[in-house]
Amino acid sequence: MECELLGEETGTFGQALESLKRGHLVTRKGWNGKGMFIFMRPEDCLSTEKVVNHVKSLPESFKKWIANNYGDSEIDKIKFTAYLCMKAADDTVVNGWLASQTDMLANDWVIVE
């Protein structure tokens, strides 16, 4: 198992992933300080009531499907798995960020302080 990144040292994508799992923000020196970094959205388990009535980031068609197939209760739960996000140079957040081959093979990953 690869260790996470420490302090200001640079490391591999594997080390960056370990750091992400521990809640750190990571970036690449090769991204030239454009304010871009990666973070992990942790897994979550939400009641179907909350999903149907309160979550704004899901389409109404999915909420309707949940209501029709699970009901609208505090007891029934939907598990949302963890995924990576990127804070992009234009200050948007990209959900479901995927590393390129270049990113995966790079040795210039660092923790954002």
Label every model-predicted segment:
Residues 1-89:
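Extended non-catalytic interaction/regulatory regions in multidomain proteins
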Residues 77-113:
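Short, compact, well-ordered microdomains
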